[in-house]
């Protein structure tokens, strides 16, 4: 059976919620889905003082896990217009897999969050997608079959490059129903593509 990994980093729970929605969508395609997160790099006392959400249910991923999946969907919050250092650090450890071509032909995708509408979501998606392309993966975005990314009657994330959410400057805004629907749509699209390519 086709296997999909939703790999994420979430400091405050927004990307965790998006990861769960991506996984729900992937499961709709009839594939096996695992959700894992990358290790935290921030010292525990700093994470506590900054109110990081440290009680996340997803297990910690190991770099060798990546070879076990037909599709890998990567999510992380935006940090100054690029992926967070926790995810970058994890992907930087994939040099051995890259050298062996171990990820060639796997399907990949990206999702993210930012504090504001113009807070670097697309550049962050591209920073993730660049890694996936270097790994030899087939990248699937969030196409315009998801009409929710065209909405003008509400503040909403979403781009053809991947699902996104807007958190607000203080992080109080949680992913909207429309943003979660976009995440589910992208998860399903990636899973269906992986199933077609890998059976």
From Swiss-Prot:
Boundaries of every Flavodoxin-like domain copy: 4-190
Top-level division of the source organism's lineage: Bacteria
Binding site for NAD(+): 12
Cofactor: FMN
GO cellular component, one term: membrane
Reaction equation(s) it catalyzes: a quinone + NADH + H(+) = a quinol + NAD(+); a quinone + NADPH + H(+) = a quinol + NADP(+)
Class of the enzyme per the UniProt entry, highest EC level: oxidoreductase
Record EC number: 1.6.5.2
Name used for this protein in its record: NAD(P)H dehydrogenase (quinone)
Biological source species: Bradyrhizobium diazoefficiens (strain JCM 10833 / BCRC 13528 / IAM 13628 / NBRC 14792 / USDA 110)
Taxonomy of the source species: Bacteria, Pseudomonadati, Pseudomonadota, Alphaproteobacteria, Hyphomicrobiales
